[in-house]
Amino acid sequence: MKHFEANFDGLVGPTHNYAGLSFGNVASLSNAALVSNPKAAAKQGLQKAKALADMGIVQGMLAPQERPDLYTLRRIGFSGSDANVLKQAAKEAPILLNACCSASSMWTANAATVSPSADTRDGKLHFTPANLVDKLHRSIEPLTTGRILTATFNDPHYFHHHSHLPEHNSFGDEGAANHTRLCKEYGHAGVELFVYGQEATNPNAPKPQKYPARQTLEASMAVARLHQLEDDNCVFIQQNPDVIDQGVFHNDVIAVGNQNVLFYHEQAFLNTQQKIDEIKRKLDTELYFIEVPTAKVTIQDAVKSYLFNTQIITLASGEMAIIAPTDCQENPAVLAYLNELLTLNTPIKQVLYFDVKQSMQNGGGPACLRLRVAMNEKEITAVNQHTLLNDALFNRLNTWIEKHYRDRLTTQDLADPQLIIESRTALDELSQIMKLGSVYQFQK
């Protein structure tokens, strides 16, 4: 049976804006109050996904969340008509309104952690939505994320869906952005790397001082237990607290893996050699550890260009390619390194550049926009087929974006009651296009 790694990219929602909500995310904060273009953002993401589908990669799409989130605004005391709720919130608590209008669910690397059936004791694909408790605007996502994932991976014979972890900082969980998987072939049992920022229950353990560590060891271990992983399938690695304090808020900003390749910055982890040795013990195959030295790419350049927030994909030829943002081309040190990388003895033989600037300006590169799901042929057949990207779905989604999305949005526009109507009309139509059923609150 054939095995693949599918990518499920998040469709950018109609309220994509730059509100600077993510403390610890340098790009998000530095671009706060820019005028956004939701239509361009959605099309950039869709075009990147289609390009991968055209390369033969199994590519799916995940629906965005309903925003503005009036249900959260009502929970915190705003009342009256929908328009009045927005008006009150804009006047009395504009930062809370911004949080309830964020399109951050586009970054599906944070949607969930996924363990393929080759790794799990029950032989099913496991999904645990991330609780995202560290950021208010993301902490309101998990319940809807779970519904969207269940509507997408909708056959319980193959897919096991868990609830998100308890909503407490001790179990801070940011999903696949702090998780990668190494293996010989996608269908073989692999080693899942769980990267954490701190131990919540050990006050003496290292942790960052300036920015929060969003992922705890306790959360990572809980997900591994839920997913029925054996010790031989897991390696728990602490991210270097110093790089978190330099803006590396998720591990996918400083490292990325694919099959037998781990591509990472020399400052990415604590106890790097010890953990590499553990990976080698647990995974008996030829491995490529590509360590990028600070002398060639500084942490600042890595964060600014998102060198590591790239996708590494395996092409039909067996060679690997890096899917990079055009920002990597615009950074001389990073471009020089990537050109050098292609001359080294590794499986990576191509670098392909994509313009995802609308996402980049909010702190999310190509890797943020996708959730990786290693699957076999039967599992792919069991997925909701209306979520898999082909020419027909691409054209329908492109038309849908053109019809429903604005090409200009400011944070002041978030108080416009018309935005509620536009967003709900768009999502209602999308849920029919993708045959999702009633995944949104307004549909219940």
UniProtKB/Swiss-Prot annotation:
<feature type="active site">
    <location>
        <position position="174"/>
    </location>
</feature>
<feature type="binding site">
    <location>
        <position position="252"/>
    </location>
    <ligand>
        <name>substrate</name>
    </ligand>
</feature>
<feature type="binding site">
    <location>
        <position position="110"/>
    </location>
    <ligand>
        <name>substrate</name>
    </ligand>
</feature>
<dbReference type="GO" id="GO:0019545">
    <property type="term" value="P:arginine catabolic process to succinate"/>
</dbReference>
<comment type="subunit">
    <text>Homodimer.</text>
</comment>
<feature type="binding site">
    <location>
        <begin position="137"/>
        <end position="138"/>
    </location>
    <ligand>
        <name>substrate</name>
    </ligand>
</feature>
<comment type="pathway">
    <text>Amino-acid degradation; L-arginine degradation via AST pathway; L-glutamate and succinate from L-arginine: step 2/5.</text>
</comment>
<keyword id="KW-0378">Hydrolase</keyword>
<feature type="active site">
    <location>
        <position position="250"/>
    </location>
</feature>
<feature type="binding site">
    <location>
        <position position="214"/>
    </location>
    <ligand>
        <name>substrate</name>
    </ligand>
</feature>
<comment type="similarity">
    <text>Belongs to the succinylarginine dihydrolase family.</text>
</comment>
<keyword id="KW-0056">Arginine metabolism</keyword>
<dbReference type="InterPro" id="IPR037031">
    <property type="entry name" value="AstB_sf"/>
</dbReference>
<feature type="binding site">
    <location>
        <begin position="19"/>
        <end position="28"/>
    </location>
    <ligand>
        <name>substrate</name>
    </ligand>
</feature>
<protein>
    <recommendedName>
        <fullName>N-succinylarginine dihydrolase</fullName>
        <ecNumber>3.5.3.23</ecNumber>
    </recommendedName>
</protein>
<feature type="binding site">
    <location>
        <position position="362"/>
    </location>
    <ligand>
        <name>substrate</name>
    </ligand>
</feature>
<dbReference type="GO" id="GO:0009015">
    <property type="term" value="F:N-succinylarginine dihydrolase activity"/>
</dbReference>
<dbReference type="Pfam" id="PF04996">
    <property type="entry name" value="AstB"/>
</dbReference>
<dbReference type="GO" id="GO:0019544">
    <property type="term" value="P:arginine catabolic process to glutamate"/>
</dbReference>
<comment type="function">
    <text>Catalyzes the hydrolysis of N(2)-succinylarginine into N(2)-succinylornithine, ammonia and CO(2).</text>
</comment>
<dbReference type="InterPro" id="IPR007079">
    <property type="entry name" value="SuccinylArg_d-Hdrlase_AstB"/>
</dbReference>
<feature type="active site" description="Nucleophile">
    <location>
        <position position="368"/>
    </location>
</feature>
